[in-house]
């Protein structure tokens, strides 16, 4: 019975950890975001990886093996729906909440813990939601 309980807990932990998000490492994002389309080492030492899964493209920037910025696009270049934006923000909430700032051409969001911000607008010619870590002041 004890082994069965441990097995159930392991399965539940795996199922609940199925979503990747800001701050996660290569392995979790590789598993969650699908096929790697492109990987580039950038001049600043970060690594940019483009993933493709289902109808989405995920552009992720890694620093020190952790995701510090993620952009979410539709493969066809169409706009993300409000429901999709809400779902992606929720996945990157880290236990905090998001507040929206409406601007003329670009929508922006701030996380209540001050550790992340997001914008919805044009990235490389496509509509995208970009979530990025906000670095603390030294």
Segments (PLM) and residue ranges:
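Functionally constrained cores in energy, signaling, and assembly domains
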Residues: 14, 24, 33
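N-terminal compositionally biased, intrinsically disordered segments and leader/signal-like regions
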Residues: 15-17, 79
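A cross-family detector of function-defining hotspots
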Residues: 28-130, 135-137
